[in-house]
Protein backbone atom coordinates (compact mmCIF):
# COMPACT_ATOMS: atom_id res chain seq x y z
CA UNK A 1 0.00 0.00 0.00
CA UNK A 2 1.39 3.39 -1.00
CA UNK A 3 1.60 6.14 1.51
CA UNK A 4 3.42 9.43 1.90
CA UNK A 5 6.34 9.53 4.24
CA UNK A 6 6.31 12.77 6.13
CA UNK A 7 9.17 14.14 8.10
CA UNK A 8 8.07 14.98 11.58
CA UNK A 9 9.16 18.09 13.41
CA UNK A 10 10.15 20.18 10.40
CA UNK A 11 7.51 22.86 10.34
CA UNK A 12 8.33 26.19 8.80
CA UNK A 13 8.31 28.95 11.34
CA UNK A 14 5.70 31.51 10.36
CA UNK A 15 7.04 35.04 10.31
CA UNK A 16 5.10 37.60 12.24
CA UNK A 17 4.28 41.08 11.05
CA UNK A 18 6.84 43.64 12.22
CA UNK A 19 4.20 46.35 12.51
CA UNK A 20 1.62 44.23 14.36
CA UNK A 21 4.24 43.05 16.87
CA UNK A 22 5.33 46.61 17.67
CA UNK A 23 1.74 47.92 17.47
CA UNK A 24 2.64 50.49 14.82
CA UNK A 25 -0.31 51.90 12.89
CA UNK A 26 1.49 54.22 10.49
CA UNK A 27 4.28 53.34 8.08
CA UNK A 28 6.31 56.52 7.65
CA UNK A 29 7.66 57.12 4.15
CA UNK A 30 10.33 59.45 5.58
CA UNK A 31 11.88 56.67 7.68
CA UNK A 32 14.20 55.37 4.97
CA UNK A 33 16.19 53.02 7.22
CA UNK A 34 13.08 50.96 8.03
CA UNK A 35 11.87 51.01 4.43
CA UNK A 36 15.20 49.62 3.17
CA UNK A 37 14.41 46.38 5.02
CA UNK A 38 11.46 45.86 2.68
CA UNK A 39 13.36 46.61 -0.55
CA UNK A 40 15.80 44.13 -2.12
CA UNK A 41 19.25 44.86 -3.58
CA UNK A 42 17.89 45.67 -7.04
CA UNK A 43 15.42 48.18 -5.63
CA UNK A 44 12.12 46.32 -5.96
CA UNK A 45 9.73 45.79 -3.06
CA UNK A 46 10.02 42.40 -1.37
CA UNK A 47 6.89 40.22 -1.37
CA UNK A 48 4.77 39.58 1.70
CA UNK A 49 6.08 36.02 1.99
CA UNK A 50 9.68 37.26 2.27
CA UNK A 51 9.02 40.08 4.74
CA UNK A 52 6.39 38.37 6.88
CA UNK A 53 4.08 41.36 6.90
CA UNK A 54 0.32 40.94 7.08
CA UNK A 55 -1.68 42.02 4.01
CA UNK A 56 -2.76 45.30 5.58
CA UNK A 57 0.74 46.42 6.48
CA UNK A 58 2.23 45.13 3.22
CA UNK A 59 -0.08 47.51 1.35
CA UNK A 60 1.01 50.35 3.63
CA UNK A 61 4.69 49.48 3.11
CA UNK A 62 4.17 49.44 -0.66
CA UNK A 63 2.52 52.85 -0.55
CA UNK A 64 5.26 54.25 1.70
CA UNK A 65 8.04 52.95 -0.59
CA UNK A 66 6.33 54.48 -3.62
CA UNK A 67 5.98 57.82 -1.83
CA UNK A 68 9.63 57.73 -0.75
CA UNK A 69 10.65 57.07 -4.36
CA UNK A 70 8.63 60.05 -5.59
CA UNK A 71 10.21 62.25 -2.92
CA UNK A 72 13.67 60.97 -4.02
CA UNK A 73 14.38 59.41 -0.62
CA UNK A 74 14.68 55.93 -2.17
CA UNK A 75 15.98 55.14 -5.65
CA UNK A 76 13.68 53.57 -8.24
CA UNK A 77 16.45 51.21 -9.30
CA UNK A 78 19.93 50.64 -7.94
CA UNK A 79 22.85 50.94 -10.35
CA UNK A 80 24.27 47.52 -11.12
CA UNK A 81 27.83 46.84 -12.20
CA UNK A 82 27.82 45.13 -15.57
CA UNK A 83 30.74 43.08 -16.78
CA UNK A 84 31.39 42.61 -20.48
CA UNK A 85 31.15 39.04 -21.65
CA UNK A 86 34.37 39.22 -23.64
CA UNK A 87 36.38 40.01 -20.50
CA UNK A 88 34.70 37.30 -18.46
CA UNK A 89 35.06 34.50 -21.02
CA UNK A 90 38.68 35.32 -21.93
CA UNK A 91 41.48 33.50 -20.08
CA UNK A 92 43.08 35.27 -17.13
CA UNK A 93 46.31 36.07 -18.98
CA UNK A 94 44.40 37.98 -21.68
CA UNK A 95 42.43 39.88 -19.06
CA UNK A 96 45.62 40.99 -17.33
CA UNK A 97 47.14 42.08 -20.62
CA UNK A 98 44.09 44.19 -21.46
CA UNK A 99 44.07 45.80 -18.04
CA UNK A 100 47.81 46.48 -18.22
CA UNK A 101 47.40 48.10 -21.65
CA UNK A 102 44.62 50.35 -20.35
CA UNK A 103 46.75 51.43 -17.39
CA UNK A 104 49.71 52.20 -19.65
CA UNK A 105 47.52 54.29 -21.98
CA UNK A 106 46.21 56.29 -19.04
CA UNK A 107 49.71 56.92 -17.66
CA UNK A 108 51.31 57.84 -20.99
CA UNK A 109 49.60 61.26 -21.54
CA UNK A 110 50.15 62.27 -17.92
CA UNK A 111 53.94 61.75 -18.11
UniProtKB/Swiss-Prot annotation:
BP term (GO), one: translation
Domain of life of the source: Bacteria
Entry keyword annotation includes Cell wall biogenesis/degradation: no
Entry keyword set: Ribonucleoprotein, Ribosomal protein, RNA-binding, rRNA-binding
Entry GO MF terms: small ribosomal subunit rRNA binding; structural constituent of ribosome
Basic and acidic residues: compositionally biased ranges: 98-111
GO cellular component: cytosolic small ribosomal subunit
Region (Disordered): 90-111
InterPro entries the record matches: Ribosomal_bS18 (IPR001648), Ribosomal_bS18_sf (IPR036870)
Gene3D superfamilies listed in its UniProt record: Ribosomal protein S18 (4.10.640.10)
UniProt entry tagged with the keyword Ion transport: no
UniProt xrefs under HAMAP family: Ribosomal_bS18
Annotated family: Belongs to the bacterial ribosomal protein bS18 family.
Function in brief: Binds as a heterodimer with protein bS6 to the central domain of the 16S rRNA, where it helps stabilize the platform of the 30S subunit.
Assembly information from the UniProt record: Part of the 30S ribosomal subunit. Forms a tight heterodimer with protein bS6.
Name this protein carries in UniProt: Small ribosomal subunit protein bS18
The organism of origin for this protein: Mycoplasmopsis synoviae (strain 53) (Mycoplasma synoviae)
Amino acid sequence: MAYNKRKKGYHNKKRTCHFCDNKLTYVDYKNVEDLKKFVNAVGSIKPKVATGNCAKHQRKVTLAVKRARLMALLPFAVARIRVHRSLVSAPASQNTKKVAEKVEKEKAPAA
